[in-house]
A protein has these predicted regions:
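Glycine-rich hexapeptide-repeat left-handed beta-helix
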Residues: 1-12, 46-62, 66-74, 81-178
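N-terminal first-folded block
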Residues: 6-11, 15-51, 67-69
């Protein structure tokens, strides 16, 4: 479906951003340079803005939604894993949000933090910069070390390259040999 305007709200898509076929970007959504929205992801900015920073990726089946007067702000160089729900929250720069995690209203994830796969970050939680958050409900487990920081960087670098490959339609078509 791609980018969809609604009355008084039209997506602003940087020319270098990638929106995969089947993804929906609706309403007051801004996608920064070299950001990517992957297959079956939905960004629904119908009640407040959604802003996605440069080089940020929203992987397959991710949902980003807002509440009346409560935007979703996703910083630069952020990796958002498959099937994540981001609801009216703020994710600062250089974070990694693990697959299947859920961030509820008024959550703020500090710069350089990691949310572990499957974590549920409760409404209003303020995560300090450089934290590893995990569990249901989520709690700060420890500080992000150099290895995790490298993983964050590797994720967004990989998705910038993948977006270019998908834009060109450059897929390996050989069947694996068993």
């Amino acid at each position: 479906m791609g980018a969809v305007a609604i009355p008084t709200r039209t997506p602003v898509i940087h020319p270098t951003a990638f929106i995969a076929p089947g993804a929906v970007v609706l309403g007051d959504v801004t996608l920064g340079p070299r950001s990517s929205v992957w297959y079956q992801a939905v960004l629904r900015g119908d009640m407040a803005p959604i802003v996605v920073g440069e080089v940020t990726n929203l992987q397959d089946a991710t949902i980003v939604h807002v509440d009346e007067g409560k935007p979703a702000l996703i910083g630069a160089r952020v990796g958002v894993g498959h099937r994540v729900i981001l609801h009216a929250c703020i994710v600062e720069d250089e974070c990694l949000i693990g697959m299947g995690s859920i961030l509820l209203n008024d959550v703020r994830i500090g710069t350089g933090s990691v949310v572990a796969a499957g974590a549920v970050v409760p409404e209003g939680m303020q995560v300090p910069p450089g934290s590893l958050v995990m569990g249901v409900p989520a709690r700060v487990a420890r500080h992000v070390d150099a290895g995790l920081r490298a993983r964050i960087r590797g994720t967004w670098e990989h998705y910038v390259a993948e977006a270019e490959r998908h834009r060109r339609g450059a897929f390996p078509l050989e069947r694996p040999t068993l």
